[in-house]
């Protein structure tokens, strides 16, 4: 039987592009873990993706995950758009390369390990876990030791 995990994610970018960060909160029963990270130059969408990737990557074994995000880009991308992108060799319906393809491939690999229910919550609407993820992401984006987002392409 798979463990049931609640995973909340958010990304933030100060400028877009600019310094960015991600935050994730994982809840398993009475256990809670918060993770975050920041990058010198990135975009909001990349940080939204990174939050989901890093949250899922934290799980050591296959789990039943209820992932809540305020990003329709992430939720629709992974549940709908990715099917066509993969069929078309990671091209959009307009025959353009998929943006953030490096992170979409990483997310696709992480998703394959788990059973995931994707939920959307309106950002900045007072949802406690989403607000906490936003705080983690903003704090990470404002940090002094920011990593390089090697996949970012202007």
Swiss-Prot record:
Q: What is this protein called?
A: Ribonuclease H
Q: Name one GO molecular function term.
A: magnesium ion binding
Q: Which InterPro entries match?
A: RNase_H, RNaseH-like_sf, RNaseH_domain, RNaseH_sf, RNaseHI
For this entry, list what GO says about its biological process.
Answer: DNA replication, removal of RNA primer
**Which parts of the sequence bind Mg(2+) 2?**
10, 134
The listed locations are: Cytoplasm
From the UniProt annotation, give the residues forming the signal peptide. none
Origin species, per record, is: Aeromonas salmonicida (strain A449)
Catalysis: reaction(s) = Endonucleolytic cleavage to 5'-phosphomonoester
Q: How does it assemble?
A: Monomer.
Q: Which cofactor(s) does the record list?
A: Mg(2+)
An annotated GO cellular component: cytoplasm
């Amino acid at each position: 039987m798979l463990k049931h995990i609640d995973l909340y994610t958010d990304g933030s970018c100060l400028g877009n592009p600019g310094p960015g960060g991600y935050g994730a909160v994982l809840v398993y029963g009475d256990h809670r873990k918060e993770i975050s990270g920041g990058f010198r130059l990135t975009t909001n969408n990349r940080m939204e993706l990174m939050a989901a990737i890093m949250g899922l990557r934290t799980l050591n074994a296959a789990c039943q995950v209820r992932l809540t995000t305020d990003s329709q880009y992430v939720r629709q991308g992974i549940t709908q758009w990715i099917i066509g992108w993969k069929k078309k060799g990671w091209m959009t319906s307009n025959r353009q390369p998929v943006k953030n393809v490096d992170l979409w491939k990483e997310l696709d690999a992480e998703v394959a390990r788990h059973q995931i229910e994707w939920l959307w919550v309106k950002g900045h609407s007072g949802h406690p876990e989403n607000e906490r993820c936003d705080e983690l992401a903003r704090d990470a984006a404002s940090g002094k030791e920011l990593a390089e987002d090697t996949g970012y392409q202007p």
